[in-house]
Amino acid sequence: MRKFTTLTSIAAPLNETNIDTDIIFPARFLLIMDKLGLGKYAFNERRNTGIKGSNFVLDTPPYLGSEILVTGARFGIGSSREQAVWALTDLGIRCIIAPSFGDIFYANCLNNGLLPIEFNGAEYQLVMQAANEAEPITIDLATQTLTASNICLLYTSPSPRDKRQSRMPSSA
């Protein structure tokens, strides 16, 4: 995963709660051990419906190539399936914004250079609105800010202990 100090991308809105790691990376692909190429299996049941083309948010303009994903609460719950994070990073996702994450998924994000950011309440609604309107969002690690056209929010980065124990870039 490429490190960054700032990231600007249109954020893809996935306004759904309780997305577990089996939805992100289905169990039938668990025997694939090479991290490269796992992105094609991310959200497989939702992206590969058998119909020509997919209407899944990450497959539709203007969200094709989004590096930021804004999701509902409890994203990444369920098993300790690290392949879910590998699939997301291989798909090009570099930051996930949600009200909450599964604990093991959160740790796996930190260990694999995928930035998880938690926002709740009105702040979360502003970020989701920006994503729904396909506004570019900028994440700045040095200032710990998220900005879009009409918002500037401070976020709490992973703790220094979490950064030391992971491969997340530090803001220094």
Provide a role label for each language-model segment:
Residues 143-149:
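Short polybasic amphipathic segments
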Residues 1-26:
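N-terminal, positively charged, Ser/Thr/Ala/Gly-biased leader segments
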Residues 166-172:
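Hydrophobic alpha-helical segments, chiefly the membrane-spanning helices
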Residues 155-162:
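Conserved small/polar residues in nucleotide/adenosyl-binding loops
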